[in-house]
């Protein structure tokens, strides 16, 4: 018969595995098999089935009622506390009952009131938020992992408020303990209860997701980073523009602000107005059927669809890329114009428009997008006016 074992270690880490055994298999031998799978010594394990601990190692599994497809819980026993030979200051052992001894106090021993507990004798780690906070602040690597895996606790840690950090830590510990109790209750429930089985399935799925994410963080941390988008320098109607290269876009587009800056709004054919649909929707003002785009030393004919609200100035779509047989060479970080053989380098992040950078300036994320667009449009118009003044005789 196939028995599924849900194992909970002392550190609350979990593992699930299955064992194929006979019904007359003794519990002692079953513990040994579990030790091989889980790494937990057989003497430290407690096996629970149907909310009942299995204690007699000489009995067979079938005598406990186990059958094919059942689930048992294997828990690692708590480690016995080791105490130094010298007595701890501030701890009173006189009230501890010793098995086989009288529980009455020894009249020859003076009864002293217990002093207040000494904070130095508290368990270290999670039971001492102040110490844990100091350890995390002193370890940049652990702090970075905490920011990735537990943002609420990291935020409380960096706030500098010990009381807030303690509160968040205790809330998370209580929530984890509650989930652990719920998980144990589900695994001990009736195996024919559909609701319980559905919750167990969801719990296993979430566990697999967390395990997959942990492996990805260890083996491929670069997958959690962001890449810089592909931009090139070009000129439209003689005006410099930073163009976004997007082979997934069907058509080449330009923002209304960029079209005004390049003085091609007079060429917009409004009969081509409509709605552009992609991740979102935007209004198309019209189309410029032919304009000149300069990339390095090449002058290429191009058409644009003008969008009313577009954060980027210009986007080179697949129509433009296929027309001029362009190829994206990521190894050399260049865009190759196939019809001419010209190479142009993709821009580094520092030269990208602000809307395309991975990190905006301080406080920029708090500014509404409409206000950012208004500022950029005002800057463009002002720059255009300054250039016009400079060209006057």
UniProtKB/Swiss-Prot annotation:
It is an enzyme of class 3 (hydrolase). GO terms for cellular component: chromosome; cytosol. Its EC number is 3.4.23.-. A motif (Ubiquitin-binding) lies at residues 370-389. Pfam families: Asp_protease, Ddi2_HDD, ubiquitin. Residues 1-81 form the Ubiquitin-like domain. It is found in: Cytoplasm, Cytosol; Chromosome. The active site is at 246. Residues 107-118 have a biased composition (Pro residues). One of its GO terms (molecular function) is identical protein binding. CDD domains: RP_DDI, Ubl_Ddi1_like. Residues 82-127 are annotated as: Disordered. Keywords: Aspartyl protease, Chromosome, Cytoplasm, Hydrolase, Protease. Homodimer. Aspartic protease that mediates the cleavage of NFE2L1/NRF1 at 'Leu-104', thereby promoting release of NFE2L1/NRF1 from the endoplasmic reticulum membrane. Ubiquitination of NFE2L1/NRF1 is a prerequisite for cleavage, suggesting that DDI2 specifically recognizes and binds ubiquitinated NFE2L1/NRF1. Seems to act as a proteasomal shuttle which links the proteasome and replication fork proteins like RTF2. Required for cellular survival following replication stress. This is Protein DDI1 homolog 2. It comes from Xenopus laevis (African clawed frog).
């Amino acid at each position: 018969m196939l028995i599924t074992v849900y194992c909970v270690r002392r550190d609350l880490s979990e593992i699930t595995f299955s064992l194929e055994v006979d019904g007359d298999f003794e519990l002692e031998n079953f513990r040994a098999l579990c030790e091989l799978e889980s790494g937990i010594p057989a003497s430290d394990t407690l096996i629970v089935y149907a909310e009942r601990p299995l204690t007699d190692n000489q009995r067979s599994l079938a005598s406990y009622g186990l059958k094919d497809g059942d689930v048992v819980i294997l828990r690692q026993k708590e480690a016995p506390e080791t105490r130094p030979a010298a007595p701890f200051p501030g701890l009173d052992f006189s009230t501890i009952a010793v098995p086989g001894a009288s529980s009455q106090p020894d009249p020859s021993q003076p009864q002293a009131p217990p002093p207040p507990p000494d904070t130095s004798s508290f368990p270290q780690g999670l039971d001492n938020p102040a110490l844990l906070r100091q350890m995390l602040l002193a370890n940049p690597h652990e702090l970075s992992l905490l920011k990735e895996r537990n943002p609420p606790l990291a935020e409380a840690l960096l706030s500098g408020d010990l009381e807030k950090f303690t509160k968040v830590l205790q809330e998370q510990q209580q929530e984890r303990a509650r989930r652990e109790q719920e998980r144990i209750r589900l695994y001990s429930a009736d195996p024919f209860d559909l609701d319980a089985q559905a919750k167990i399935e969801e719990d296993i799925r979430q566990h697999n997701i967390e395990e997959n994410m942990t492996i990805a963080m260890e083996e491929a941390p670069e997958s959690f980073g962001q890449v810089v988008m592909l931009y090139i320098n070009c000129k439209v109607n003689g005006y410099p523009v930073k163009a976004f290269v997007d082979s997934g876009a069907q058509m080449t587009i330009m923002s209304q602000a960029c079209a005004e800056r390049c003085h091609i709004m007079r060429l917009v054919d409004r009969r081509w107005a409509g709605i552009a649909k992609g991740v979102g929707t935007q209004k198309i003002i019209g189309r410029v059927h032919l304009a000149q785009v300069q990339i390095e030393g090449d002058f290429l004919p191009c058409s644009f669809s003008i969008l009313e609200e577009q954060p980027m100035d210009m986007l080179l779509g697949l129509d433009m890329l296929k027309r001029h047989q362009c190829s994206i060479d990521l190894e050399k970080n260049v865009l190759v114009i196939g019809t001419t053989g010209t190479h142009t380098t993709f821009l580094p992040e520092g030269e990208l428009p602000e809307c395309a950078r991975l990190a905006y300036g301080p406080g920029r994320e708090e500014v509404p997008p409409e206000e950012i667009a208004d500022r950029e449009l005002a800057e463009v118009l002002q720059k255009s006016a300054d250039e016009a003044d400079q060209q006057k005789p």
